[in-house]
Amino acid sequence: MSTSSHMYPMSSGHDQHSYIHNSSYQKAAISSAVEKTRRCIFEKLDLQLSSDFGTFRIADFGCSIGPNTFHVAQSIIDTVKSKRLEESTENSLVPLEFQVFFNDQPTNDFNTLFRTQPLSPEREYFSVGVPGSFYGRVLPRNSIHIGHTSYTTHWLSKVPDNVCDKKSMAWNKNYIQCNNLLEEVTKAYKVQFIKDMEIFLDARAEELVPGGLMIVIGECLPDGVSLYETWQGYVMDTIGDCLMDMAKSGITSEEKIDLFSLPVYFPQFSELKGEIEKNGSFTIELMETTSHPLEGKPLTNDFITSTFRAFLTTIIEKHFGDGVVDELFYRLAKKLSNHPIDFEMRKKQVVYCIVLKRK
C-alpha cells in the first residue's frame, strides 16, 4: 500500500465526529504558544516589508477545517495591527489590508471551512483557499509575510518505501505506525521525514518574503523517548490491536492490516532541530519545548477516542472500506475502559514552538 497523507484530510463535515468538533487538544497547544509568537512578531518582524503594496499576507499551511485556523489568523492580525500602531506616528498610518491563504490538501473540506469562517465585519481579512500539498510550493515566490503551520509536519508525504513490503527488513509487521520498536522501520520513517522536512522548508523559503516569519507548532518526542512509551503511542498500538481482533472476527482481513501503515512520524526533538538547522534559508528566532497544557488533566476515554477518530477516519475508511470505523472506535473505547491509560507512568510527548526568519 502506497499511502499518501495528501489523500487523507481530517474528518469533514459538521457532525459529532468531525475534526471541527474534535480539535480542542490541538487548540490548547496552539493557544499556549500565542504569547511567544506574539513576542517574536513584535521583536523580529519588519513591517516595512508590506509597505510597498499595503497588503499584509498570511498563510496557514495544513489549515484543515475551523475553528483553530481562524483563531490563528486573527491572532496574527491582531498582533501585526498592535505592532503597527505602536510603531507609527499619528499621521503616518497608511491603510493596511490583510489577506489570509488557507492551505490544505485538495480533498480537505474547504466548503465547511469557508461556511464556518467569521463573517464581515468581524472578519478583518480577505480569504483565499489554496488546495495542494505543502510538501512543495503552493504560493508565488516572495508573497507571504507570515506563515504558520500547527500539528501538521508529523504527517509525512507518504508511507516510507518497504514498510508494507513483507519481503523487506523494514516491514512494519503487527503495527500500524512507527512506534520505534522496530529499528529498520524507524530508520525508514526517519529517512522519509528528513526528505519531507527539507522539501517543506525549501518551499516555505521561496514563498516567504526576505525577513518574513514562519511559525511551526506541533508535538515531538523528547530525546531518548520512544513513541510506544507515550500514551499517544499506546492508543495507536491499541487501535492496531482492535484491527487484529476485527480480522479474527472476519470484519476485515489480516492481509489488509499487513498492508497498512500510517504516514505519521513523531521525531525526537534533536532530529527536528537538526533538520531545521541544516536548512540554510532561515535564522532560528525561537525554538522551545514545553509540556502540553492538558498534561496532568484527566483525559476521558470519550475524549481520546473522539480525538483519534477525527484524524484517522478518512485514511481507515479508504483502506479498510465502509462500515469499519464505527466498530473500530467502539472497540477502542471498550479496550481503554478495560485497560485504562496510566498517564503518570507513561512518558510524555512535548509541544514545540518554533519561529524562523527568512534570510
Swiss-Prot record:
Pfam families: Methyltransf_7
Cofactor(s) listed: Mg(2+)
Amino-acid positions noted as binding Mg(2+) in the UniProt annotation, renumbered to this chain: 172, 258, 260
Disulfide cross-links: none
This protein's UniProt keywords: Magnesium, Metal-binding, Methyltransferase, S-adenosyl-L-methionine, Transferase
Binding site for S-adenosyl-L-homocysteine: 19, 63, 68, 104, 133-134
Catalytic activity, EC: 2.1.1.-
Cofactor binding: number and manner: Binds 1 Mg(2+) ion per subunit.
Top EC class for this record: transferase
Domain of life: Eukaryota
GO molecular-function terms, A-Z: metal ion binding; methyltransferase activity
InterPro entries in UniProt: MeTrfase_7, MeTrfase_capping, SAM-dependent_MTases_sf
GO BP annotations listed: methylation
Family designation: Belongs to the methyltransferase superfamily. Type-7 methyltransferase family.
Subunit structure: Homodimer.
Official protein name in the record: Probable S-adenosylmethionine-dependent methyltransferase At5g38100
Species, as recorded: Arabidopsis thaliana (Mouse-ear cress)
